[in-house]
Amino acid sequence: MLSQTIKSGDWKGEKHVPVIEYEKEGDLVKVEVSVGKEIPHPNTPEHHIAWIQLWFHPEDGAFPILVGKVEFSNHTDPLTEPRAVFFFRTQKKGKLYALSYCNIHGLWENEVTLE
């Protein structure tokens, strides 16, 4: 199963774990997802974050909904940063899930509760 290959951890001690930060004003939700907030992640052709996905699973929902995906295509000068900002609207509570993919260390996830 794919779920058995996804790694997680504390983003303060593991540079691959995506960090999820959000602000909510009314029904507008702004979410920033970044990799390497505390410990910078390399961004070279040999070792880089290829993409980040953000998912939202409403409390009453049967399955998560893909909010968006960002691909990072350049790993030379000028360097891209593994960081993305997403906007969506909801009045529901639920879970925000972020996935990131490192070309050497695979899939990483994190989650936060959207109040």
Curated annotation (Swiss-Prot):
<comment type="subunit">
    <text>Homotetramer.</text>
</comment>
<protein>
    <recommendedName>
        <fullName>Superoxide reductase</fullName>
        <ecNumber>1.15.1.2</ecNumber>
    </recommendedName>
</protein>
<keyword id="KW-0249">Electron transport</keyword>
<feature type="binding site">
    <location>
        <position position="102"/>
    </location>
    <ligand>
        <name>Fe cation</name>
    </ligand>
</feature>
<dbReference type="InterPro" id="IPR002742">
    <property type="entry name" value="Desulfoferrodoxin_Fe-bd_dom"/>
</dbReference>
<dbReference type="Pfam" id="PF01880">
    <property type="entry name" value="Desulfoferrodox"/>
</dbReference>
<feature type="binding site">
    <location>
        <position position="47"/>
    </location>
    <ligand>
        <name>Fe cation</name>
    </ligand>
</feature>
<dbReference type="InterPro" id="IPR051233">
    <property type="entry name" value="Desulfoferrodoxin_SOR"/>
</dbReference>
<dbReference type="GO" id="GO:0005506">
    <property type="term" value="F:iron ion binding"/>
</dbReference>
<dbReference type="GO" id="GO:0050605">
    <property type="term" value="F:superoxide reductase activity"/>
</dbReference>
<keyword id="KW-0408">Iron</keyword>
<keyword id="KW-0560">Oxidoreductase</keyword>
<feature type="binding site">
    <location>
        <position position="105"/>
    </location>
    <ligand>
        <name>Fe cation</name>
    </ligand>
</feature>
<comment type="function">
    <text>Uses electrons from reduced NADP, by way of rubredoxin and an oxidoreductase, to catalyze the reduction of superoxide to hydrogen peroxide.</text>
</comment>
<keyword id="KW-0813">Transport</keyword>
<comment type="similarity">
    <text>Belongs to the desulfoferrodoxin family.</text>
</comment>
<dbReference type="InterPro" id="IPR036073">
    <property type="entry name" value="Desulfoferrodoxin_Fe-bd_dom_sf"/>
</dbReference>
<feature type="binding site">
    <location>
        <position position="16"/>
    </location>
    <ligand>
        <name>Fe cation</name>
    </ligand>
</feature>
<feature type="binding site">
    <location>
        <position position="14"/>
    </location>
    <ligand>
        <name>Fe cation</name>
    </ligand>
</feature>
<keyword id="KW-0479">Metal-binding</keyword>
<feature type="binding site">
    <location>
        <position position="41"/>
    </location>
    <ligand>
        <name>Fe cation</name>
    </ligand>
</feature>
